[in-house]
């Protein structure tokens, strides 16, 4: 017998024996009612009846309240319990939820338990069938009276009493509380089937704290009978029998017997095995076939169990094969129960069937042999029909009726229950064909079959489950997981597929041939077919499958090349139009732009815009582009390519004769949606990455091409620009594999943009492991083998998308964090090293969104990016210059690796003689950085005007060719945004704040530089003095008495000047506007959540939303969508400026508050651009809050200087002194009203940033 653990105690059942998870809590269930094959439950609360239930996910035995003994004997860290939890965001009433005990603070027990339990609440409530549950990171403190102990059925069943179960057992694991793990499921199966056959109603309830299967009659409903009927199942001489017991619930006449039944050891061994490898006692009609050869997929060290059923009946086998929906969760009683009475060779009472039981220990020692053999002696037990001797005559359940005919409705009801039992009781086993198993997985061993023995020596093989195909179909009984060796072979197979794809697709692209094929798709297809036929002639041994695969690849390529937006003309007409005629186009309102000489259609009518829409007004910050400045030619008279803009003035939407010979003809639909600065940047990208916008003049091997930078203001449409460029670039260079790297917050935006613009290019998004486990996207499907774990699934998903990325022209998108994880060189896993190798060598084009982030010289991410083997790069940034010229140099080198060479050629006079020397790349980069800082940076930083101008000119001459800069009005569209007003509020501190800030400032004056701990404390104290208590370093600078006084100020909003301003502003505008609050730290966000809840009675998740770095990708997307929802209930969004200041759109907000200042001005600029961007319908007001006389003033002056340097680098005109950017005036009516009503003089100075602000 299995030894009991000390924590497994037996307990009587609760008067309400079950509990179900509904409406966010576990509710007590009085009884389960089974009628006509359906199961319903009656709740204790309000007597409500539930009929649409998931019994194996949300139903279990009711948990019992914890006692004083449980604290000492059972409760410990690591076990699962049910706790009473206060969930503020959903309901004010506490609810019962599942949790895990993390730690226990033990205290001496007196009259009651005073111990404190730290528990972590599960996120996935009501899903007890999950193997792994997600837990909330924030622990919850509960007491013993708020804990309930989980319960499960005990292993001992009553066989001769009116009750079936007497006790329940304590359970320490949430997964083990499932009702389908023990012997309760076979009983439930019998009750459901019997209720359909004979219209009997059962109730599973508690009587005298014992579980009873009560049979409900009319007398019970009327209350005229004092006795009740209950059903129980017993075993007599190896025969399973069901019987009815009459009992009086008013008298407890049934006493427990001290004598326990003795059960044969072999049967117990079989019954104790897990349900996935064994069957219940009364369904054990089987025998074990010896193991045989195993392939690499077998689950070491386990073997497949193969059940053999001996039968004397041919028609019985046919009956079983006709039913198509049998599942392993329902066993032999159903087959006995549903036998057809009128069959020619019906079931005979005199004939007996056999259960062949094999000793478990001997089964492991069996050798692999062909055929059927036994290595141990078998014990044979007589087994008669299960339901023949059931003594239920008063209910009409005799043997003849049970073996009677079965109607179609009955089979439908049984099939309905069988599907539910298979779904929730056990993972449904998938069926595969033998050919798929052998070809895909290399399976060599036989598949588990069921051998039905006849009286003769021959045997017949068929499957236990009734298949939809051939009746001889075999079935494999699989384990839950694969072995480590199987995982490795499965991953190796994916990596070999990538290698074969790279070898097949890694060929150089002929630009001229590709362009001619795009211009004349028909001839291109003919040439491709000719090349295909030549290859087939050369290789006489090419299989038919390879030919079909090649034809499919050609069709896929043709479908991609033959875009619906392109004009399709035959070869003869094309040559006639291009060679024999000098076209003179005129507009035909039915056809389009037609040549009046030859009739050639230059532009279809669907691509011609209306006359009133051809000329759109374009607004920029500094000047208008004159028509005379735009050149309509591509090549000058000398045959040298012109570097001027090539968009025609007459109509930007209509391709001219010259445009049909350049890349604009590749994206006619997208071109109409691009704005002027995007069109200039589009040609800029082609010239830097391909050498020209004319395919005939492109030279991919030229030394002049290289990486480039697109530095457009935030919100100017950089993402759409790159998407349009990639759509055209992959048509000319299908073998270039673009890799897009972006911050985690912008991955969702990239994916939506591809869908929004209907780009005909496949996009493969590589998730991080944690994001993949939480996402609903499961692209990998496995047939015939157990489903791998989440980690292996994530690896296979990455490898599968990388293989598709190589197989056809497509885009691979992933986050910087995932890229850095895969690029680790010290990984011990072979697949990690392989993926790192592929990501280094395969990309033909590297796109770095927000590429200014990896700018540090020591950054591991930057070092990994520099190792990517391609010079073709696009770096996107709205704020290119960050902190200093060293980081600026690193950013330019990241975008254009050739920049190192260009700097040395320009600045190092000795480099010309030493360039033949082969030096390491990092040494050359260090040398170039030194010259860049010593010559250019020093000249720009000097106060001498002429020397500064010289340095700026040198920098522009070196970088203007590969940097495209656009400083518009904050909008990337042709629509003019309503306006932007930026105010800097220099605020006075309250008395308590002033005392703390003065002390911290005095301590900082004794240090050289800015210690991080002091900087953090000053930043927090400037918002509210209580926030210093949230840090771990506060005890270093404040004594316990001071901290005690500070603790009392938590909920006093008047003690913080910034807090008072935020509450006043929100109070005045909340009814008509939404507010976006940015903060560098998390502690102020939590404080403001509590203040908003107390002052405005708002709730988190409804009016209050938070966007921080700990949220996963999809959760961030849901928060953004909820805040952007028109007419939604959200009012305030508190966001972390570090995690959420880039790449997202929050145009629902028209008021932006910056609680603290940043060292990097680009962060503030990016944060403002979340609200002030295309789609904004209101004037945006920005409030930068600074505390007077503190470190925040120094940070603000430093960031202003950085903005000025950045303006000088990219502006060709004179940039005025930063002191002239500010003006002491207020044009905001709300702000003016707050200042007028300010009685405590919170504001020292209010300045408006005239340079950054726009009209509004």
UniProtKB/Swiss-Prot annotation:
GO terms for cellular component: nucleolus; nucleoplasm. Its main location: nucleus. ATP binds at residues 712-719. GO terms for molecular function: ATP binding; chromatin binding; helicase activity; hydrolase activity. Residues 451-463 have a biased composition (Basic residues). Disruption phenotype: Decreased, but not completely blocked de novo methylation. Probably due to a partial redundancy with CLSY2. It comes from the Eukaryota. InterPro entries: CLSY/DRD1, Helicase_ATP-bd, Helicase_C-like, P-loop_NTPase, SAWADEE_dom, SNF2-like_sf, SNF2/RAD54-like_C, SNF2_N. Residues 269-290, 448-467 are annotated as: Disordered. Residues 278-290 have a biased composition (Basic and acidic residues). SUPFAM superfamilies: P-loop containing nucleoside triphosphate hydrolases (SSF52540). The keyword Hydrolase applies. Keywords: ATP-binding, Helicase, Hydrolase, Nucleotide-binding, Nucleus. GO terms for biological process: gene silencing by siRNA-directed DNA methylation; positive regulation of post-transcriptional gene silencing by RNA; regulatory ncRNA-mediated gene silencing. The keyword Nucleotide-binding applies. Changing residue 592 to E: Loss of endogenous 24-nt siRNAs. It is found in: Nucleus, Nucleoplasm; Nucleus, Nucleolus. Residues 1061-1222 form the Helicase C-terminal domain. Residues 699-898 form the Helicase ATP-binding domain. Associates in vivo with Pol IV but not with Pol V. Belongs to the helicase family. Interacts with NRPD1, NRPD3 and SHH1. This is SNF2 domain-containing protein CLASSY 1. It comes from Arabidopsis thaliana (Mouse-ear cress). The lineage of its organism: Eukaryota, Viridiplantae, Streptophyta, Embryophyta, Tracheophyta.
């Amino acid at each position: 017998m299995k030894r009991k653990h000390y924590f497994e105690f037996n307990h009587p059942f609760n008067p309400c024996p079950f509990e179900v998870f509904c409406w966010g809590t576990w509710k007590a269930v009085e009884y389960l009612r089974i009628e006509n094959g359906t199961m319903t439950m009656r709740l204790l609360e309000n007597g409500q009846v539930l009929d649409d239930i998931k019994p194996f996910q949300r139903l279990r035995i009711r948990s019992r309240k914890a006692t004083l003994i449980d604290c000492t004997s059972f409760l410990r860290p690591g076990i699962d319990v049910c706790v009473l939890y206060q969930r503020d965001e959903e309901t004010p009433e506490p609810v019962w939820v599942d949790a895990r005990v993390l730690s226990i603070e033990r205290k001496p027990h007196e009259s009651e338990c005073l111990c404190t339990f730290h528990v972590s609440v599960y996120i996935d409530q009501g899903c007890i069938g999950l193997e792994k549950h997600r837990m909330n990171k924030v622990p919850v403190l509960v007491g013993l009276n708020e804990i309930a102990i989980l319960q499960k059925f005990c292993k001992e069943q009553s066989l001769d009493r009116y009750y079936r179960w007497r006790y329940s057992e304590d359970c320490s694991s949430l997964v083990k509380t499932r009702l389908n793990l023990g012997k309760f499921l076979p009983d439930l199966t019998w009750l459901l089937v019997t209720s359909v056959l004979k219209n009997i109603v059962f109730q599973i309830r508690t009587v005298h704290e014992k579980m009873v299967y009560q049979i409900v009659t009319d007398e019970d409903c009327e209350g005229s009978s004092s006795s009740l009927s209950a059903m129980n199942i017993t075993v007599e001489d190896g025969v399973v029998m069901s019987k009815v017991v009459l009992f009086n619930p008013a008298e407890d006449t049934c006493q427990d017997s001290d004598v326990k039944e003795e059960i044969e050891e072999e049967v117990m061994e079989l019954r104790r095995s897990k349900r996935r490898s064994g069957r219940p006692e009364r369904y054990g009609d089987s025998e074990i076939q010896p193991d045989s050869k195993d392939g690499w997929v077998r689950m070491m060290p386990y073997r497949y169990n193969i059940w053999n059923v001996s039968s004397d009946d041919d028609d019985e086998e046919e009956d079983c094969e006709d039913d198509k929906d049998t599942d392993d969760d329902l066993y032999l009683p159903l087959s006995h129960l549903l036998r057809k009475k009128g069959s020619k060779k019906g079931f005979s009472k005199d004939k007996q069937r056999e259960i062949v039981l094999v000793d478990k220990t001997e089964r492991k020692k069996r050798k692999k042999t062909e055929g059927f053999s036994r290595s141990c002696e078998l014990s044979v037990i007589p087994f008669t029909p299960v339901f023949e001797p059931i003594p239920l005559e008063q209910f009409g359940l005799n043997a003849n009726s049970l073996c009677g005919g079965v109607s179609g409705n009955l089979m439908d009801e049984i099939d309905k229950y069988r599907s539910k039992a298979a779904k929730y009781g056990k993972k449904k086993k998938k069926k595969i064909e033998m050919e798929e198993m052998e070809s895909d997985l290399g399976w060599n061993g036989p598949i588990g079959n069921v051998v039905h023995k006849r009286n003769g020596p021959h045997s017949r093989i068929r499957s236990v489950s009734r298949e939809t195909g051939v009746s001889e179909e075999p079935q494999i009984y699989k384990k839950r997981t694969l072995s480590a060796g199987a995982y490795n072979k499965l991953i190796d197979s994916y990596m070999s597929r990538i290698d074969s794809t790279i070898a097949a697709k890694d060929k150089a692209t002929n630009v001229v041939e590709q362009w001619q094929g795009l211009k004349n798709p028909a001839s291109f297809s003919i040439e491709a077919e000719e090349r295909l036929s030549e290859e087939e002639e050369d290789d006489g041994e090419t299989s038919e499958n390879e030919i079909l695969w090649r034809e499919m690849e050609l069709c896929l390529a043709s479908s991609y090349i033959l875009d619906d937006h392109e004009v399709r003309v035959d070869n003869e007409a094309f040559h006639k139009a291009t060679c024999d005629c000098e076209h003179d186009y005129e507009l035909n309102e039915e056809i389009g732009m037609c040549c009046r000489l030859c009739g050639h259609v230059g532009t279809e009518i669907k691509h011609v815009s209306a006359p009133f829409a051809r000329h759109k007004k374009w607004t920029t910050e500094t000047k208008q582009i004159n028509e005379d400045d735009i050149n309509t030619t591509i090549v000058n008279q000398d045959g040298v390519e012109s570097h001027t803009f090539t968009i025609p003035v007459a109509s930007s939407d209509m391709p001219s004769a010259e445009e049909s010979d350049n890349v604009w003809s590749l994206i006619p639909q997208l071109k109409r949606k691009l704005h002027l600065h995007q069109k200039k940047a589009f040609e800029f990208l082609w010239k830097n990455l391909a050498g020209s916008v004319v395919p005939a003049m492109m030279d991919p091997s030229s030394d002049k091409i290289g990486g480039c930078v697109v530095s457009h203001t935030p919100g100017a449409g950089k993402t759409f620009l790159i998407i349009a460029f990639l759509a055209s670039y992959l048509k000319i260079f299908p073998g270039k594999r673009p890799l897009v790297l972006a911050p985690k917050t912008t991955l969702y935006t990239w994916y939506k943009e591809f869908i929004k613009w209907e780009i005909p290019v496949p996009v493969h998004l590589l998730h991080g492991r944690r994001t993949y486990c939480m996402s609903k996207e499961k692209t990998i499907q496995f047939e015939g083998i157990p489903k791998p774990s989440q980690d292996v699934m994530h690896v296979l998903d990455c490898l599968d998308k990388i293989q598709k990325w190589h197989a056809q022209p497509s885009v691979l998108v992933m986050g910087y964090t995932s890229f850095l994880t895969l690029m680790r060189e010290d990984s011990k896993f072979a697949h990690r090293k392989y993926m790192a190798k592929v990501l280094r060598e395969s990309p033909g084009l590297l796109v770095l969104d927000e590429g200014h982030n990896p700018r540090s010289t020591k950054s591991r991410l930057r070092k990994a990016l520099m190792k990517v083997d391609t010079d073709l790069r696009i770096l996107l940034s709205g704020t290119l210059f960050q902190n200093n010229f060293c980081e600026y140099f690193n950013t330019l080198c990241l975008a254009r690796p050739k920049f190192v060479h260009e700097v040395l050629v320009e600045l190092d006079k000795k480099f010309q003689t030493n360039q033949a020397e082969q030096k390491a790349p990092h040494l050359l980069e260090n040398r170039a950085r030194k010259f860049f800082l010593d010559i250019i940076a020093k000249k720009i930083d000097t106060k001498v005007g002429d020397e500064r101008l010289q340095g700026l000119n040198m920098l522009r001459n070196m970088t203007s060719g590969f940097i495209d800069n656009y400083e518009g009005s904050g909008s990337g569209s042709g629509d003019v945004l309503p306006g932007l007003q930026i105010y800097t509020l220099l605020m006075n501190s309250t008395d308590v704040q002033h005392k703390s800030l003065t002390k911290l400032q005095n301590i900082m004056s004794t240090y050289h530089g800015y210690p991080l701990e002091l900087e953090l404390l000053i930043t927090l104290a400037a918002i509210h003095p209580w926030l210093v208590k949230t840090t771990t370093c506060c005890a270093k600078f404040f004594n316990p008495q001071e901290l005690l006084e500070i603790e009392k100020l938590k909920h006093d909003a008047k003690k913080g000047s910034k807090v008072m301003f935020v509450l006043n502003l929100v109070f005045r505008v909340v009814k008509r506007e939404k507010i976006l609050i940015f903060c560098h730290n998390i502690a102020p966000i939590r404080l403001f959540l509590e203040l908003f809840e107390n002052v405005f009675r708002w709730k988190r998740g409804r009016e209050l939303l938070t966007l921080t770095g700990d949220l996963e990708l999809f959760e961030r997307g849901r928060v953004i969508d909820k805040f952007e929802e028109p007419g939604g209930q959200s009012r305030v969004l508190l966001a972390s400026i570090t995690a959420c200041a880039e790449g997202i759109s929050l145009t629902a907000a028209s008021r932006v508050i910056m609680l603290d200042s940043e060292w990097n001005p680009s962060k503030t600029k990016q944060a403002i651009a979340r609200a002030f961007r295309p789609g904004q319908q209101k004037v945006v007001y920005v409030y930068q809050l600074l505390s007077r006389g503190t470190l925040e003033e120094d940070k603000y002056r430093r960031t202003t200087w950085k903005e000025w340097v950045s303006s000088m680098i990219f502006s060709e005109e004179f940039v005025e002194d930063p002191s002239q950017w500010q003006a002491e005036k207020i044009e905001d009516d709300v702000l003016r009203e707050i200042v007028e009503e300010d009685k405590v003089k919170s504001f020292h100075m209010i300045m408006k940033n005239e340079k950054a602000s726009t009209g509004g």
